[in-house]
Each structure stands twice: as structure tokens, then as C-alpha cells.
Swiss-Prot record:
GO MF annotation list: protein-macromolecule adaptor activity; ubiquitin protein ligase binding
Organism whose genome encodes this protein: Eremothecium gossypii (strain ATCC 10895 / CBS 109.51 / FGSC 9923 / NRRL Y-1056)
InterPro entries: Arrestin_domain-protein (IPR050357), LDB19_N (IPR024391)
UniProt KW keywords: Cytoplasm, Golgi apparatus
Gene designation per UniProt: LDB19
Subcellular location: Cytoplasm; Golgi apparatus
Protein name from the UniProt record: Protein LDB19
GO biological process terms held by the UniProt record: cellular response to amino acid stimulus; cellular response to stress; positive regulation of receptor internalization; ubiquitin-dependent endocytosis
Length: 684
């Protein structure tokens, strides 16, 4: 996937850039800021670079350049779109923007005289893992979350007045959740016996396709069956943003919050009407107030969730973390429940600390279509319908581009035009009160068919069960040779009784020609054993919804805490000696004057002193006991002549424990088991 490259372009001398003695520059040296994992588990991202001050030579020679102050600030900017209320809240610039300082560096705290040339100052910061990613929210894209590095310098050249220079560099922060095992979901649709099994990936990406495996089971029962007619899918994005007001208009926001709370209480007394959304339906914007009972966005008790709830066949997917826990592992289940309870309590505390609980919710459909073919139906036994399809998300653009790594006052950053942003990756930030979730909704329309024979005779329950298991064999036996290619007519017979009667007459005519004989009563025995289905006019809509985790691709990078630290040898100064250097002397001595002879694992190694002169190695022979009842272990026993001695590491054989061998009449030295298992000595 290729992103349009953003470069820092500009004209030298524009906006008075040529008459300044001091030029500022920002250069990012660290990899792109990618937060790996969910907000509760992410280790953050490292941001490091250089801020440069270039003093022109002419200004320095004229009287010197004194930099009074040079600061660098990393700030988070949240621009709120329309608050959907008239009055000062919609027109106040302070209410529409919120700034938060994440880090601050006093590069030059006191006045300092700088010589002509380039001066570089490094900086670094660890971005917290719970920060929201750079995002554009809503259908209009007016609400945005951005990060910027702002360099501010105040200088005085040649004894003149103080002048100020400012430089901004946008910092792109993205979040990537690594893909795990696919999720298997099971849905049940009472009062029918139909069950749906879906297989979905754990995470999805913008500008990609989502594989979906769907299987319907239990579509055949007794004398009826369900035939799939259409499948409709859509992806809904739910955005919830807490309203923001400046200190001057905070009282007006509280009054608006009380009005919305009273209106919500009145609406709760009325029966909720479900909203039937379609793929071509526009965004739906609602205003709500968070309470202690409903602190989290998109809970079952929220207004938007109650309106979209359908008690018939809606089944929310469970938390993705529970899919990795074995049902019998109660300890891990309890630990997960405690963790979720703590997170919920923290979010409750965050809600209570906030000055307002007024939220703006927007629900929109970002993708969806209908599928009318492509599945396979098998009506043998209990029956099943299988479908494997690709959900197209290639038109979804999250606005992520290549990051800008270098800007300067002579070449400032100018944003180029790009494709409109129509999707936002998942965001969960209780501090800002911003939440973005995605749901995949699947609706399957199945039509009911009544099974009967081609002559119109209905099936009893016992016959239907017997025919369901051996329907293929019965059809093969009853089908004449002349109708071997009438599969298309059989499909038409399942659609309408008129085609069934036509096929029945054709089958009888062919059966009379190919039948070897008739029954005593003049009727054929297997001519009318074919089973067809006739639509009854009844249909059901099977609705399912699955929670999707939309995230950016991780790329080739890894988290900073997963990187391998440098070795001692890679640090050029004050590093301790390596292992090889410490034992090089002993290794050289051992390699020139020692050998090791050992038996299998069942026998301890036998060491005997060996002469230092390069003589013929001692003969190794098998003793007479090797052919006894001890087996292979005894056959592998090696005996060393008493004239030889073996030693390791320059140790004297006298220090080793001696064992008398009565059968051979000489002494051998045996090492301890702990010394035999010393891998360092063995490798040396």
C-alpha cells in the first residue's frame, strides 16, 4: 500500500524569512510513533530528534546573536466540530479547541550568545500507551485529534530589539493491535433449530478485505426446511465525543446538560422504537448524558443501544479477550473479570471528575451491500448452508500518511490535499471522553419450504426423517436413466408446484418406458419418491452483530521494549571483559595438553592421566563383562589401560577420587556428576 508522501515545501524569503538572523529546524530521528497493543497494555512509543538553531554569519559579525529563550513543546490538540447547539457554544473559538501539554523542554533557559553556525540540541520523550491516535472523527471530519512539536525562540541580534521565531512539526501517532487467532462465534435463533457459526479475524484494517466464513446449521427439520434467499451486511461506526466548553461558557453547558437529562428521562417512559438502518442511510446524530448506571459508551443501557436493540435475534459478541480463556480455567476467568471491574471503576471515577457529562453520539454506516448468490446448500440430514465471502473495505480511508521527519523555518510544513477521511480506527480515551467503535451487522433472509413428493403427497414426520438421511440414495434409485440431465427441472420444481406437476408427468412417462414392470395394482413403486420443496410464504430475518476491532497495520517495526539491547562488545567504552577473553588462557592450555574420554550417559565419565608427549593414544578395549546380562550399557563401557592418565583444566589426578577396579587391577579417577554436567568445561 503506497501513501502519498508529505514533504516540507516552501519558498525562501516568504513571510519575512530572509530578514531573520536565526533559523530554526526540527528533525525526527526515531521511527514512526506506533502504539502497539490496546491502551491498557501498550508500552508507548519513543520520540526523539534534534532541534537546530542556525545563526547567520552576517548577523553574528554585526554584533553577535543572543538567544534569550528557546523552548520545545509537545502538545495534543483536540479540535471539536459543531456542538449542535446555537449560541456562544457554537461560535466561541476557545470552546472549539482544547490543548494539552505532554512534554516541555527548556532548551535555552537563560540568555546565551551563540556564534555563527549550526547548533543542535537533542530531545526525547516516551509517549504514553493510553494516548489516542491521530484521528479525524465524524462524517464531516470536523473533530480531530492531532499532535505537534512547537519550537519557540526569542533572540536579539546586533543589540536590536527582541524578535520571535516559531516552528511547528506535526507528529503522526498511530495505534496497531497485533492480529491474533480468528474468532469463532455461535448464534442460536429460537424458536427454530437454525444455528449460525461465523469465523472472523480478530482485527481488521482500512483499505482491505475481511474474510467471513458463515455456516447455517439445522435448516432441515421434519417436513420443512429453510432456504437462504439473501444476505445483507453493513459496518456501522459509532462515535461518542464529550462536549467541551471554556471557563466563560461552562455554566451554559451545565444548563444544556440538565435539559438533555430531563428530556432523556421523559423518553425512557415511552416504549422504544427500534431504528431499522440500511446501508444507504445517512448518519444519525443524538445527544445524551452519561450517568452512573451508563458511564461507558455504547452499553446496553445507552439511548442509542436501546433504539437499535431487537429482542428477536440480536446477540452481541462477547469480549475478545474471553476467547483466549479455556472454559475450565476459572482462575483466569476471575482474574479477567476483576480486571474489567477495575477498568470500569476507573472510568467511573474519570466520569465523576469531569465537569460535564454531555455527549454527542453519531452512528453512520461506512460500508455495506447485499449478496444474493454464492452459497452452497446441503439439505441432507439436518441440513447446512455454507458461505465464504470477502467484505470489501477498500474504500475506507483513515487519513494515515507518511510522517514528516524534517521541517525548518525556511521550508515549513505545508499539508497537501488528500482523499477524504471516511473511517476512524478504534479509540477509547476516558480522559478526553472520546470513543469510537465498529460493529458488523449481518442479516440473513431465509424462506420456509414444505417438503412433499412430486405427486403432491405430504411427508409424515417419520418418513421425512428417514428420507432426509437417505434422500440421495432414494433419488438415485428412483431416477430413470432418461432423466439423468434433468437437474435444472428439479430446481424449478422446488420453486413452484406448477413445475413440479410438469416434472411429475415427464417422470411418469419416462418411467413407463424404462420401468421393467408394474406392481400388481398397476402403479409404479418408486416413481413418486422424489422430494421437492414448495415455498409456504413464511420467511425469517436472522440478525447478527459482531464487534470489530479496526486498527492500523503494524508494518515492519516492533515495540521499543521488545528490541534486543546491545551487547557489551558493542559499547566501546567501560565495558566489562567478555567471556572469551577471560577464559582464553585456560582454553589454550587445555587444548594443548588434555583430552576427554567418556562413556554413554548411563556411565559416569572416566578420566585417567595421559602423558604429555605425543605418543600413541591408549588402546580402548571391551572387557569380558560387556557380553554379560548388562545389555548395551555394559557393551558401551570403555576400559583404559593403567599406563595412561587423563586430566582436564590442568588439575592433578591425585585430587580426584580414586576407585579400585578389582577385575583390571588398577586405579581410575572418577569425576562427580555435577562436574560432568558442567557445559562450560565441556565446550572448552
Amino acid at each position: 500500500m503506497v501513501f502519498p508522501r508529505l514533504v516540507a515545501t516552501g519558498r525562501r524569503g516568504s513571510a519575512g524569512g530572509s530578514d531573520h538572523v536565526v533559523e530554526l529546524g526540527l528533525e525526527i530521528e526515531s521511527p514512526p510513533c506506533v502504539l502497539y497493543g490496546p491502551p491498557t497494555e501498550s508500552a508507548g512509543a519513543l520520540l526523539s530528534g534534534l532541534v537546530t538553531v542556525h545563526v547567520q554569519g552576517a548577523g553574528a559579525e554585526a554584533g553577535g546573536c543572543v538567544v534569550a529563550r528557546l523552548t520545545l513543546v509537545l502538545e495534543q490538540q483536540v479540535t471539536y466540530g459543531r456542538p449542535f447547539v446555537a449560541g456562544p457554544l457554537g461560535s466561541c473559538a476557545a470552546c472549539r479547541e482544547r490543548r494539552r501539554e505532554l512534554a516541555r523542554w527548556e532548551v535555552v533557559a537563560q540568555a546565551a550568545e551563540l556564534a555563527g553556525g549550526r547548533h543542535a540540541y537533542p530531545f526525547s520523550h516516551l509517549l504514553a500507551g493510553e494516548l489516542p491516535a491521530t484521528s479525524t472523527l465524524g462524517s464531516a471530519g470536523a473533530t480531530q485529534i492531532r499532535y505537534e512539536l512547537v519550537a519557540d525562540a526569542v533572540y536579539r541580534a546586533g543589540g536590536g530589539e527582541e524578535r520571535r521565531r516559531e516552528l511547528r512539526l506535526p507528529v503522526l501517532v498511530t495505534r496497531s493491535i497485533l492480529r491474533g487467532p480468528d474468532r469463532n462465534s455461535l448464534r442460536v435463533f429460537p424458536p427454530t433449530d437454525v444455528t449460525a457459526t461465523a469465523v472472523l479475524p480478530s482485527v481488521i484494517y482500512p483499505r482491505s478485505t475481511i474474510p467471513l466464513e458463515l455456516q447455517l446449521g439445522g435448516v432441515c427439520c421434519a417436513d420443512r426446511r429453510w432456504r437462504m434467499r439473501r444476505l445483507t451486511w453493513r459496518i456501522d461506526e459509532k462515535v461518542r465525543v464529550r462536549s467541551h466548553a471554556c471557563a466563560a461558557h461552562r455554566a451554559r453547558l451545565r444548563a444544556l446538560e440538565e435539559e438533555v437529562r430531563a428530556k432523556t428521562a421523559r423518553n425512557l417512559k415511552k416504549p422504544a422504537k427500534p431504528i431499522k438502518r440500511t446501508p444507504d442511510m445517512g448518519p444519525q446524530v443524538t445527544v445524551s448524558v452519561a450517568t452512573v448506571e451508563d458511564p461507558l459508551p455504547f452499553d446496553a443501557g445507552s439511548a442509542a443501544a436501546r433504539q437499535e436493540a431487537d429482542v428477536g435475534n440480536m446477540d452481541d459478541d462477547a469480549d475478545t479477550q474471553s476467547a483466549f480463556i479455556h472454559p475450565s480455567d476459572h482462575a483466569m476467568q476471575q482474574e479477567l473479570q476483576e480486571l474489567q471491574a477495575r477498568i470500569r471503576q476507573q472510568q467511573l471515577e474519570e466520569e465523576r471528575k469531569q465537569e460535564t457529562s454531555h455527549y454527542i453520539e453519531e452512528v453512520r454506516t461506512i460500508a455495506g451491500t447485499d449478496i444474493r448468490s454464492g452459497w452452497k446448500s446441503d439439505f441432507s440430514g439436518s441440513g447446512k448452508i455454507e458461505l465464504v465471502m470477502e467484505i470489501d473495505c477498500m474504500k475506507l480511508n483513515s487519513g494515515v500518511t507518511n510522517p514528516v521527519n524534517m521541517v525548518s523555518t525556511t521550508s515549513p510544513y505545508l499539508a497537501r490535499g488528500q482523499a477524504p477521511v471516511n473511517v476512524t480506527c478504534d479509540v477509547e480515551d476516558p480522559t478526553l471522553g472520546i470513543s469510537v467503535n465498529h460493529l458488523l451487522l449481518v442479516e440473513i433472509i431465509v424462506a420456509e419450504e414444505m417438503l412433499h413428493y412430486t405427486n403432491g403427497q405430504l411427508l409424515s414426520k417419520g418418513e421425512a426423517q428417514g428420507e432426509g438421511e437417505g434422500q440421495g440414495e432414494a433419488l438415485a434409485e428412483a431416477k430413470p436413466a432418461g432423466l439423468a440431465g434433468s437437474h435444472a427441472d428439479q430446481r424449478l420444481a422446488e420453486l413452484s408446484p406448477m413445475f413440479a406437476n410438469r416434472n411429475n408427468s415427464m417422470f411418469r412417462a419416462s418411467a413407463e418406458e424404462h420401468s421393467p414392470g408394474l406392481e400388481p395394482d398397476g402403479s409404479t413403486a418408486g416413481a413418486d419418491k422424489r422430494i421437492v420443496g414448495t415455498p409456504t410464504g413464511a420467511a425469517r430475518v436472522l440478525r447478527m452483530q459482531f464487534k470489530l476491532t479496526m486498527t492500523e497495520r503494524s508494518g515492519l517495526g516492533i515495540s521499543w521494549d521488545d528490541e534486543v539491547p546491545p551487547k557489551y562488545q558493542q559499547v566501546k567504552f567501560l565495558y566489562p571483559p567478555s567471556y572469551d577473553e577471560a577464559v582464553s588462557a585456560s582454553v589454550s592450555e587445555v587444548s594443548g595438553s588434555s583430552r576427554v574420554v567418556s562413556g554413554p550417559e548411563s556411565n559416569p565419565a572416566v578420566r585417567a592421566p595421559v602423558a604429555a608427549s605425543p605418543t600413541q593414544p591408549p588402546a580402548v578395549r571391551e572387557g569380558p563383562s560387556s557380553l554379560g546380562t548388562s545389555g548395551s550399557a555394559a557393551r558401551d563401557m570403555m576400559f583404559i589401560s593403567e599406563s595412561s592418565t587423563l586430566c582436564i583444566g590442568g588439575e592433578s589426578p591425585s585430587a580426584l577420587p580414586a576407585v579400585e577396579d578389582a577385575s583390571l587391577g588398577h586405579r581410575v579417577c572418577v569425576r562427580k556428576v555435577s562436574e560432568l554436567l558442567d557445559t562450560d568445561r565441556i565446550t572448552q
